[in-house]
Regions:
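Conserved AMP-binding loop of ANL adenylate-forming enzymes
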Residues: 106-140
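Active-site glycine/GP-rich loop and adjacent strand/helix microenvironment
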Residues: 1-17, 138-255
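Short, conserved acidic/polar surface loops in the N-terminal third of protein domains
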Residues: 86-90, 110, 127-130, 155, ...
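Short, flexible loop segments at the rims of nucleotide/cofactor-binding pockets, characterized by
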Residues: 93-94, 120, 141-145
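Nucleotide 5′-phosphate-binding alpha/beta core
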Residues: 1-76, 82-99, 103-107, 188
Length: 255
């Protein structure tokens, strides 16, 4: 594995903070595993894993690692396959998330001159509000449409001269098909498409790009770690770039 000295120090500080919390989910797991700190790669490899069920068992606020007075927001997984996972956010978490998402926009070539139409859902889901926070921090104009109402989406796309469209891949495909069907491609100014929450194969991506004439970007994220915006592909199309000063990614052999 590859991990820098700076990253080890960051992990060590966080681990020691969690161990000191008497009734905290992660602190308890670390103490049970005999962890006292992380000063080497060997120490890092000894950290215990957490699985989805572990996070569900912490419902509702067992994952909070700060006093409740410091929690400014919660988000939640859908809970369609079991108890939802609730993630508490501090003010700093919200700010850091916006910084990462703003980077995603910049990586995709979005500027403060752009008009960004945001169609992912809001509410407990992390998608819409994440797209909006990064957009506003960057300084672009957010058009917070939310999901559905395709007729209005297309009307705003034309009236507002939207230049960046954000959506799930399936909704982007629906919009692309409607633009073709209605023959309005010459009435829109889209230049970028950023999708998230769903995987899209090369065939679907090409279909969307051909119909809308846009550059296609795909973000990465998950509710348990900030939300969407912790990574994005670049214009060269060689996989995802993850913000390693915020998130350390390790690929684990399940065996």
């Amino acid at each position: 594995m590859q991990i820098t000295e700076t990253q080890l120090k960051q992990v060590d500080a966080q681990v020691k903070r969690l161990i000191a919390l008497p009734d905290h989910f992660y602190g308890k797991r670390l103490r049970e595993a005999g962890i006292t700190g992380v000063s080497s790669v060997e120490d890092f490899l000894a950290l215990p894993f957490c699985e989805k069920q572990d996070l569900r068992e912490a419902y509702p606020l067992g994952l909070a690692a700060v006093p409740e007075s410091e929690i400014v927001r919660i988000h939640s997984s859908s809970g369609t396959t079991g108890t939802p996972v609730i993630i508490p956010y501090t003010k700093k978490d919200v700010e850091d998330w916006a910084i990462q998402f703003a980077r995603c926009y910049e990586y995709a070539g979005v500027t403060p001159e752009d008009r960004v139409q945001i169609t992912p859902g809001y509410g407990l889901w992390t998608a819409g509000i994440g797209f909006q926070a990064g957009c506003e921090l960057l300084g672009a104009m957010a058009v917070p449409m939310g999901p559905g109402n395709t007729e209005k989406q297309l009307q705003f796309m034309m009236d507002m001269q939207t230049t960046v469209f954000t959506a799930t891949a399936s909704y982007a495909l629906l919009i692309a098909e409607e633009v073709e069907k209605r023959g309005i491609k010459d009435k829109i100014r889209l230049r970028k498409l950023i999708t998230g929450s769903e995987r899209a194969g090369e065939k679907i991506r090409k279909r969307i790009v051909d119909a809308l004439g846009v550059e296609y970007y795909d973000i990465y994220g998950l509710t348990e770690i900030y939300g969407p915006g912790i990574g994005i592909n670049c214009a060269h199309g060689h996989g995802m770039h993850v913000w390693s000063d915020y998130v350390y990614v390790e690929i684990i052999d399940p065996e």
